[in-house]
């Protein structure tokens, strides 16, 4: 159980772990242009299922490609945040929950398909960018999970939280209080 998740999302972790990956692009013809060593859908499923158990939740941050491969992922729950290549109605029979835009799932954690900038008070876990991306960009902390960037390997959300990846991300509440104190001093 990940207790820091907001209430609507806590059920994702009540019976297992939460794994996240993006930009699977199953059977998309342009994958080889993005990365010449793009692996097959079957190879991707094998990597995913090597980590994700039947009791876990799998979150895809968009750009699924051919949806029929999703049924081969052995997770208990499958969640999708739509990407720029995803048609809204195409995945309703393959995912348990589908979201259309960026999603704050905890105080300091934002899931999105495309990177979101200008939010130094949260960790943005996203995909979309098929090049390697530095952890900090434009003052914001990011984890890029485009499949080809992260070795087609999903991350375990609970594990990265325990490892302290968000420990150095300031709280928006703290930032608001600090700014108010600064304003008060200027008066």
Model-derived regions, located:
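Conserved beta-sheet core of the metallophosphoesterase superfamily
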Residues: 90-181
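Metal-centered catalytic cores of metalloenzymes
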Residues: 187
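N-terminal active-site segment of His-dependent metallophosphoesterases
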Residues: 1-69, 146-149, 162-163, 174, ...
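Short coil/turn linker and secondary-structure boundary residues
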Residues: 39, 82, 152-155
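Generic structural signal for beta-strand residues in well-ordered domains
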Residues: 11, 51, 71-73, 104, ...
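Metal-dependent catalytic neighborhoods of phosphoester/phosphodiester hydrolases
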Residues: 32, 61-76, 82, 87-106, ...
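A general structural motif
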Residues: 15, 55, 75-77, 120-121
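Active-site neighborhood of phospho(di)ester-bond hydrolases with catalytic His/Asp-centered motifs
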Residues: 20-22, 58-63, 79-84, 111-112, ...
């Amino acid at each position: 159980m990940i207790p820091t998740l907001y209430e609507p999302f806590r059920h994702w972790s009540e019976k297992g772990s939460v794994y996240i990956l993006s930009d699977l692009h199953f059977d998309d013809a342009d994958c080889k242009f993005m990365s010449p060593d793009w692996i097959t859908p079957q190879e991707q499923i094998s990597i995913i299922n090597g980590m994700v158990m039947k009791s876990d939740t799998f979150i895809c941050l968009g750009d699924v490609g051919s949806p029929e491969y999703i049924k081969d992922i052995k997770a208990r729950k499958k969640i999708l945040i739509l990407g720029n290549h995803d048609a809204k109605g195409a995945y309703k029979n393959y995912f348990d929950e589908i979201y259309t835009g960026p999603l704050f799932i905890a105080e300091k954690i934002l899931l999105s398909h495309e990177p979101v900038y200008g939010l130094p008070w949260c960790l943005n876990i996203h995909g979309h960018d098929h090049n390697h991306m530095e952890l900090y960009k434009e003052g914001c902390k990011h984890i890029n999970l485009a499949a080809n960037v992260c070795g087609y390997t999903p991350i375990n959300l609970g594990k990265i939280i325990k490892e302290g990846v968000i420990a150095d991300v300031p709280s928006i509440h703290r930032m608001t209080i600090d700014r108010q104190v600064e304003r008060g001093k200027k008066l």
